[in-house]
């Protein structure tokens, strides 16, 4: 996609909106959270500024370093921050780094399209840093300024040398008093930086970890074509990667896709290089265009007869991996909702539709073998969906209702309330724990479904086999929102679906099988934050007996130390191996009572990463899984690790 330079980037292009004091008081408002996610977000803010320079046609190389002290430096070869005096009476870099919303992307400033959609930028990074140093190469000189203690300038902007280069180097150390962790994860950064490199053809991003001499270079000549190939790397594909690009009413569009033999679709969309996780008008434009083009082609070559209904979009997109990347000028940019996760610009729909329609119709004509294969696959998907719909309707109309009710009646213990907004469904491993859960639950709003048999691995199985699996069928009926393309979040019977298993490897396996099913066939459940993992305690510490007995619980070895101090000498420790070892009262108190339980909400943070992990770890190819395990799993004699030790967890109170 063409990069364009349209505006001057100088002191006058820097516009100021408000002061910086609020950031340290409410960091979550600016970076989302103060856990590992927020910590890594600081890096993305600085990198996105460098990417904006590349987008504007300046520089094509960014170097990100994790230093030994967990400080971060980001070096680009853009124009360098403007170094003159700003109209506020301070050097411009000081304004950029100390005033919130001061930057070249506000107003029609230094950038035509900018990725800093959240618009907080360098000043917020400075506010949340122990120290930050900016080094600028511009106009033949090297300039430097240092800030400490949350963005206070300790030097003015100083000339420290001469240079023939241009660019900006930002070096900062996150403030440990602001973050729950200040240790950077190489893998987390590399996934996001890889994404930035995919989206800009020819951009080279280097990630260097000085703590352990790791280094990765991301550079993709084919841009989003390489991104699609990366998503499908471990899948069996049915076509080459196809890509289209074009411009329509000043909106630039990049679209690439490839089909695999799986059953789910995976579309990732971006606006000005920033992910739109909830889709929007650009996604709808691409979907509409694909549906129209495939139907027109199918009729033209008589794969669909006159009497046949048109293929639905979901049938056509079965097995599709696609990337949509649009660049929209600031004056046209509109989002729905606060989080900017969904594009609202109506012009984007017609731009994407026009470009994809025209080029896809041409592609199908020119590649008849591939086109016919894909249309036949869609027809098969349509037939399977129709059969599933009939089966569901028969179940609803009563022909098979008795059977579906029987499937549930022996297993599901329903909640007393009929209010889906309050009700919770516990999926419990095994009958004995299921029995305790039924006795211990709050009958008003908690339903319990014990899982007796083996849950099928839905990543490997065909749709027909999945519906033959009794456990999966029972779960589908209990949740009540349908399944696959017909799933509707509005029809579900519960506000929380809670997976409760033993704290051992078998329990973890059941969790993963259920999560794979929800991810593939009820993804909106996860996207809307309805899926949770219950955390039963690992230890019970007791002292005394009868009415004087003191009982405390610990969820981790760390917590155990505090509990032992609290109980005092003469204690007895019990290590729980399974839920069945707890009686109903204990299970209620530790794992089911909303006042005292701990739940882990399942979220999708990085869609591309999740897609690849599910394919690698749950798919039918053994080799990629073996390689991943060799690279990422340390085998030892230690007890299995606790889920609470995962650095990607963020903590929130239950409401």
From Swiss-Prot:
Name listed for the protein in its UniProt record: DNA topoisomerase 4 subunit B
Biased composition (Basic and acidic residues): 387-397
Chain ranges of the Toprim domain: 423-537
EC number in record: 5.6.2.2
Binding positions (Mg(2+) 2): 502, 504
SMART domains: HATPase_c, TOP2c
CDD domains cross-referenced by the UniProt entry: HATPase_GyrB-like, TopoII_Trans_DNA_gyrase
GO biological process, one term: DNA topological change
Site feature Interaction with DNA, where: 454, 457, 509, 625
Binding site for Mg(2+) 1: 429, 502
Catalyses which reaction(s): ATP-dependent breakage, passage and rejoining of double-stranded DNA
Keywords: ATP-binding, DNA-binding, Isomerase, Magnesium, Metal-binding, Nucleotide-binding, Topoisomerase
Function: Topoisomerase IV is essential for chromosome segregation. It relaxes supercoiled DNA. Performs the decatenation events required during the replication of a circular DNA molecule.
Any single Gene Ontology cellular-component annotation: chromosome
Cofactor note: Binds two Mg(2+) per subunit. The magnesium ions form salt bridges with both the protein and the DNA. Can also accept other divalent metal cations, such as Mn(2+) or Ca(2+).
DNA repair listed as a keyword: no
Enzyme class: isomerase
UniProt-annotated binding residues for ATP: 9, 49, 76, 116-122, 340
PROSITE patterns named in the record: TOPOISOMERASE_II, TOPRIM
Keyword Cytoplasm recorded: no
GO molecular function: ATP binding; DNA binding; DNA negative supercoiling activity; metal ion binding
